[in-house]
Regions:
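Membrane-interface transmembrane helices that cradle and orient dolichyl/undecaprenyl
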Residues: 110-111, 116, 151-167, 177, ...
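Extracytosolic helix-loop segments that constitute the early lumenal/periplasmic catalytic or substrate-binding loops
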Residues: 22-24, 41-66, 70-73, 77
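Transmembrane-helix signature of polytopic, membrane-embedded enzymes
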Residues: 11-15, 105-127
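Transmembrane-helix motifs of polytopic, lipid-linked glycan transferases
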Residues: 92-112
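Specific aromatic-rich, kink-prone transmembrane helix
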Residues: 104, 143-160, 331-334
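Transmembrane-lumen/periplasm boundary regions of multi-pass, lipid-linked membrane glycan transferases
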Residues: 43-46, 158, 173, 180, ...
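Short acidic/glycine- and proline-prone juxtamembrane loop motifs at membrane-interface regions
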Residues: 87-90, 130-143
């Protein structure tokens, strides 16, 4: 095979992987109703777009600086490009991050071992149920995975390179990753790369002024959104972004206040989150440990790095199933190393059996996540309710003429009844609003508490009503 033929074959294989990955992440993406944590990102992004305040995140009208701002900014920016905040603009940042993660796993596998290893790792990752599932969900979790992989890939491009530019890019990747979910964007790359940095006293080469200068620049970049919130945000906001960073990352680690999973949580969920390929990486781990002195150094680093990440997450007092997501690509990479090693020992290319297995797994996931799941969650419910409200209200006046009042509503609702009028007015359940009497008393209360006039003929009031309860203002 000539160099040109080999280059063409390699790139054709990569394009197939990336093309299938895009299909699996995009098919049916806009059909499924909001789910679970997506509602928080949808509500906060919607209120930013409605109010024009991108420095003070609010959830249903209340201050909610639970995550750094850039994860919301990605959604609002996508909404600006697509022209609307909807399922597509909400989930597209996660989809792009998941797609890039597949590419990055391929690149890391190719750098560490071989192109065959990279391709197998990529196919394993994109045919992993929970990776694809979370890649189609609007949260910051897959964004963090992508940031971790980007930092690891950049490091392995030149682990002994001490140029200032190399340090700058590396630490900026860490800063940006930390701005998407939290300080684990700094911690996880440092942990997984630590064994390699310590080996052969490599760390001595990297203790220099250039590294310190690059780290200072990255820290300055990291602080920019918090500084903007402090300097230009609403004076009455009442929450500190940096204070909540410490609470959500440091306090939660040592003194957890929720998500109190048992210490064996990740012994259960790491295999579950790597299905259907969990047996492969478990066998690979066993093979690596049995032949520790004889396997290549990069394989030993991978085992050490995976172990450190596992210990870190287990040591945290706050544990949830999906916290294990950053380990998934590296577990699959370990499995791919073993498969490629077996193929090399037998002097075979990726056989028909593996291709069929990847194809069946991808096809099944495509049917479940791209067709069945969106279909089963795409009709009725809050989505249909929003369409019905729009139809009935638009029969009386243009939809954009209506103002919305939300009284302790379902988190899903605001996205489905948005318009181009003034921002929604949220009323919490503990506020002393009129619950009995007529609507005139409620309208007067709204005018008084909001400082704005609500036209009764152009105001829609949403409140949760449970079956059997008396009707509000009945």
């Amino acid at each position: 095979m000539t160099v040109i033929q080999r280059w063409t074959s390699e790139h054709r294989a990569l394009l197939l992987l990336l093309g299938v990955s895009a299909l699996m992440l995009l098919l049916g993406l806009g059909s499924r109703e909001l789910w679970g944590p997506e509602t928080r990102w949808a509500n906060i992004a919607l209120q930013m777009l409605q109010s024009g305040d991108y420095l003070d995140p609010y959830l249903k009208g209340s201050a909610y600086y639970d995550k750094p701002l850039p994860s919301y900014w990605l959604i609002t920016a996508t909404a600006g490009v697509l022209g609307d905040l909807n399922h597509w603009s909400l989930r597209l940042p996660s989809v792009i991050a998941a797609w890039l993660s597949v590419w990055l796993v391929y690149l890391i596998g190719k750098q560490l071992f071989s192109q065959t290893t990279g391709l197998i790792a990529g196919w394993m990752l994109i045919s992993t149920f929970y990776f694809v599932f979370w890649g189609r969900v609007a949260t910051a979790d897959i964004l963090t995975v992508c940031g971790l992989l980007a930092a690891v890939w950049w490091y392995w491009r030149g682990p002994d390179d001490t140029r200032f530019s190399r340090y700058c890019v590396f630490f900026l990747l860490l800063a940006v990753s930390s701005l998407l979910k939290g300080l684990i964007g700094f911690v996880l790359p440092g942990l997984i790369l630590l064994p390699h940095v310590l080996s052969e006293q490599r760390w001595k080469r990297h203790v220099n002024v250039r590294l310190c200068a690059a780290l200072a620049i990255a820290l300055a970049v990291y602080l920019i959104p918090f500084a903007l919130s402090h300097l230009y945000g609403a004076a009455s906001y009442g929450q500190s972004g940096l204070g909540l960073v410490l609470r959500e990352n440091v306090v939660r680690f040592f003194q957890p206040f929720d998500n109190l999973g048992p210490i064996y949580t990740y012994l259960l969920y790491l295999p579950a989150y790597t299905l259907p390929w969990a047996p492969v990486w478990i066998i690979a781990l066993w093979v690596a440990l049995r032949n520790w002195r004889h396997i290549e150094p990069n394989a030993r680093w991978l085992v050490w790095g995976l172990a450190l990440l596992f210990v870190f997450f287990t040591a945290s007092g706050s544990r949830r199933s999906y916290y294990v997501l950053p380990l998934v690509p590296f577990a699959q990479l370990l499995g791919a190393w073993w498969v490629a090693l077996r193929l090399q020992q037998r002097k075979k290319v990726v056989g028909r059996g593996w291709k069929v297995a990847f194809g069946l797994s991808c096809g099944l996931l495509l049917l479940v996540l791209g067709v069945f799941y969106p279909w089963s969650n795409g009709g009725g419910g809050v989505m249909q309710f929003g369409q019905d409200v729009k139809a009935r209200a638009s029969a009386q006046a243009p939809w954009d003429d209506w103002r919305m009042v939300m009284i302790e509503v379902d988190n899903k609702l605001p996205l489905y009844v948005q318009n181009d009028n003034q921002p929604f007015y949220f009323v919490s359940e503990d506020q002393d609003y009129p619950r009995q009497g007529d609507s005139a008393a409620l309208m007067a209360w709204l005018d008084k508490t909001s400082g704005h006039h609500f036209d009764p003929k152009r105001t829609l009031i949403f409140a949760q009503h449970r079956s059997g309860d008396p009707l509000p203002l009945g």
